[in-house]
Amino acid sequence: MDKKLYDNYVKILENELVPALGCTEPIAIAYAAAKAREILGEFPDHVEMRCSGNIIKNVKGVTVPNSDGQRGIDVAAILGIVGGDASRELEVLESVKQEDIEKTRELAAAGYCTCTLQEDVANLYIVAKVCKGSHYAEVTIINRHTYITKIVKDDAILFEAAVSEESSNYVDKSLLNVKDILEFANTVDIDDVIAVLKRQIDMNSAIADEGLIHPYGAQIGRTLLQVYGDDVKIRAKARAAAGSDARMGGCSLPVVINSGSGNQGMTVSLPVIEFAKSLFCTEEQLYRALVVSNLVAIHQKKYIGSLSAYCGAVSAACGSGAAITYLYGGTYEDISATIVNTIGNVGGIVCDGAKSSCAAKIASAVDAAILGHFLGRKHHWFQPGEGIVQKDVEGTIKSMGYIGRVGMKDTDKQILNIMIDQVKVD
């Protein structure tokens, strides 16, 4: 493989597979607010948040980590101001103390934070403005959960960056394709990727254990094992769902994310880990399979976009299915069939925000990926011209990406309208 392409793929994994404490949208709000408070240099009198619809959608129903069960944009922002450490970025709330939680509860009840919907902006858009007397500081985040594009203090612009990927961390995701991903997985020097992949295995396995031991959320993972038994096909989706049960329920354990999402990070990894155990795979085989799952998921998301009405569990599960087929020695054709079969089955599940039902959607998506895997190994796959299925895997990925990015735009708006009570459904 060309060295430039090889280095780009390594960099993609390093950039994308990072730890995050709690659901990434409320964490991004906490980070923006904590950073604004740091710039202000004193404790503010109040905070004003302006957020895109997708941010509001993904924060409204999820428990803010380390908040003792509190929910909402105001809670995330206030907790970031009161007890957050902006230098920790996606782990901004890791060092929160009990007194910070109680103060957050009091300030939220007193209306300390206001939030307004910002329309006609990027899907991932957050502005945190903190005020003290006549002084203020404002931090803007666009496109990535920790990508600050502007810092203002008292009308003076202290920092401004292009609304694009950080230049120092730039990677070209347009170079991703299934064929090259498989070549990279087969040939990569494990030492170049072991750090990020081992961290993903360790952290995501720990939160899956937590979700199976304790009754978080709707207990999807626990219910799957109780009702359907202990077969690897059940364990694979149960552990991914259990991790989401815990994360959506406010568990403070960190997760290694994929495409900016903890749920997607767990979905691309935990089913693959479970199948690798059942097949008695070596650590190296597991690492190479995780390269496949992570990059296949990221490949799809570059067409779908970071936040949309398209449930990211589906693209993540496609990655898992591809990696499971890879573990079984599947060819490029078998792996392509797995991806197409998964997209053709559950592509288009809607995202109506981060919440407890995400775990159920993960279970459904992983189930479809496992079915897609078994069909693919038998050389069965949905044919070109059937729905959005194209002549090859790349065309099918692009067509589903178009549906998610363009076709579901109005769906996204109407989901938000329902969630914030802007429409009456008769």
Predicted regions and their residues:
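Early transmembrane hairpin of solute transport permeases
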Residues: 27-126, 130
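Acidic-glycine-rich active-site phosphate/pyrophosphate-binding loop
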Residues: 1-10, 43-55, 231-250, 282-300, ...
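Conserved phosphate/anionic-ligand binding catalytic regions in large, soluble enzymes, centered on
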Residues: 19-35, 253-270, 311-315
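Internal helix-turn-beta structural module
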Residues: 338-426
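Signature of multi-pass transmembrane helix bundles
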Residues: 108-250, 415-426
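Flexible, glycine/charged-enriched surface loops at secondary-structure junctions
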Residues: 43-47, 88-93, 115-116, 191-197, ...
